[in-house]
Amino acid sequence: MAGAAGPGSGPGAAGGDGDDSLYPIAVLIDELRNEDVQLRLNSIKKLSTIALALGVERTRTELLPFLTDTIYDEDEVLLALAEQLGNFTGLVGGPDFAHCLLPPLESLATVEETVVRDKAVESLRQISQEHTPVALEAHFVPLVKRLASGDWFTSRTSACGLFSVCYPRASNAVKAEIRQHFRSLCSDDTPMVRRAAASKLGEFAKVLELDSVKTEIVPLFTNLASDEQDSVRLLAVEACVSIAQLLSQEDLEALVMPTLRQAAEDKSWRVRYMVADKFSELQKAVGPKIALSDLIPAFQSLLRDCEAEVRAAAAHKVRELCENLPAEGRETVIMNQILPYIKELVSDTNQHVKSALASVIMGLSTVLGKENTIEHLLPLFLAQLKDECPEVRLNIISNLDCVNEVIGIRQLSQSLLPAIVELAEDAKWRVRLAIIEYMPLLAGQLGVEFFDEKLNSLCMAWLVDHVYAIREAATNNLMKLVQKFGTEWAQNTIVPKVLVMANDPNYLHRMTTLFCINALSEACGKEITTKQMLPIVLKMAGDQVANVRFNVAKSLQKIGPILDTNALQGEVKPVLQKLGQDEDMDVKYFAQEAISVLALA
């Protein structure tokens, strides 16, 4: 590159011409060749600044050829370059000159690193829209053809992503050539190329004329769906969604459904997984009639698949499948053709399958209505609530509101609540712990009145559990409940019960009072803390057990910042000073620490 700011010039070259404005640009251009990768990367990221300074003509004639010739760099630098060039049209003189950006991007689309190629293709797709139809045929289509017939598989995979953007604006003769190139890539010897073609088959189908979809795309789909590589076959399933949307019911039944049915029974679980994963989209694409006759049987076999991953993917789609069924006859189809399979999955041996089902099964209550929910779904919910897998239980509890809307709180409390209470009092402390963690969620769904009536006593009972982890979790639970239900509720319902525990004969329970005060003080605010909690804490400073006394010091340190100066100086300070002289070393230490932290010395 010639001139003051040429890449070969040092920074001094620009300065020597007396043009100081180009000095930093010369530095940036020099850095494009620097041995330090980070400097090259920084310079590439400022490429638009360099281009602006050079002007459109020099960018076209000097910068772009330089970049094209030097594309032998670290992947990170090439990735940044591919991204920058996608937004460069304005810097080379606008759409009339967009074709100047094609050579460097063509080189980038052939490199070994996938992320660089993908970014180059993304930028090429962007730039294709800025070409006029004439320029597209003169410059862009030849580039696509070169990539499509390149010796290296890398260029051929990149070509697959470019057919759909140039096809709609091409002339009929060129369209035929583009289709021919795409066909040959679909039967390429290299699996990576066939994969790339299969992944773009649906996108390409959308821009083709209907006749071409039927005569060319469908045969390609059929071949790719029976490819020897399962990674190609599963991408063909994805393409099926787009293809199905384009065809009439008659053509679908004759041309596509046999292949799709075959995919649902493919010998590779990955292909069957893809059918399950795309099931809702396929159901919408083929329409209600074919869905009932062809897809429901396929779905049943996926729900009973020998691979857990496939069953889990199908289970995830149960709710959507049921919601997408035509309203007329929906209930009968679900009750006779889906529910028996769901019942089996509730006791599946794999926890991922059960968890997937639990995340959607509650939603069926809105589809099936009150009576069916009570008779058929509630027993399943109960079974899942008692499942040994915590995730299954959580997914049921998290979605209780769906059922609440359909059957009402009273019915819910009569059926599911006893199970929740049973778990809350389970002999295994880890089960109790799991229920505590769900409690704020449950409380939010059931509302304050219901909570006070049915669950409040449980929450208080956990505070005196014989396992410390339960007492600790119960304390945090109270704080979350106060955040949900507000300070007035705390003042009337929770705080009095917590403070009564300060007189408990068991010192562990007395300490729990302090832990609760630590957790609740912030949520309850200054007034409740000062008037109701502080007097109890101060009184406990005279406890006979040293562990209680040093926790008093820790509590005063915790709630101190919430209190006003009068309370701190008049009430807290004397008590901490007294504890600071305690005969127990730990009490003395924590009292002195509190005095220091609260600046009461």
Swiss-Prot record:
Annotated HEAT repeat ranges: 20-58, 59-96, 97-135, 136-173, 174-212, 213-251, 252-290, 291-333, 334-372, 373-411, 412-450, 451-489, 490-528, 529-567, 568-601
Pfam families the record matches: HEAT, HEAT_2, PPP2R1A-like_HEAT
Modified residues annotated as N-acetylalanine in this record: 2
Keywords, in A-Z order: Acetylation, Repeat
KW Repeat (keyword) present: yes
Stretches of the chain forming a coiled coil according to its record: none
One GO cellular component term noted in the UniProt record for this chain: glutamatergic synapse
Cross-referenced PROSITE patterns: HEAT_REPEAT (PS50077)
Cytoplasm as UniProt keyword: no
InterPro entries attached to this UniProt entry: ARM-like (IPR011989), ARM-type_fold (IPR016024), HEAT (IPR000357), HEAT_type_2 (IPR021133), PP2A/SF3B1-like_HEAT (IPR054573), PP2A_Regulatory_Subunit_A (IPR051023)
First and last residue of the signal peptide: none
Domain description: Each HEAT repeat appears to consist of two alpha helices joined by a hydrophilic region, the intrarepeat loop. The repeat units may be arranged laterally to form a rod-like structure.
Family: Belongs to the phosphatase 2A regulatory subunit A family.
Description of how the protein assembles with itself and partners: PP2A consists of a common heterodimeric core enzyme, composed of a 36 kDa catalytic subunit (subunit C) and a 65 kDa constant regulatory subunit (PR65 or subunit A), that associates with a variety of regulatory subunits. Proteins that associate with the core dimer include three families of regulatory subunits B (the R2/B/PR55/B55, R3/B''/PR72/PR130/PR59 and R5/B'/B56 families), the 48 kDa variable regulatory subunit, viral proteins, and cell signaling molecules. Interacts with IPO9. Interacts with SGO1. Interacts with RAF1.
Task of the protein: The PR65 subunit of protein phosphatase 2A serves as a scaffolding molecule to coordinate the assembly of the catalytic subunit and a variable regulatory B subunit.
Name this polypeptide is given: Serine/threonine-protein phosphatase 2A 65 kDa regulatory subunit A beta isoform
Native species: Mus musculus
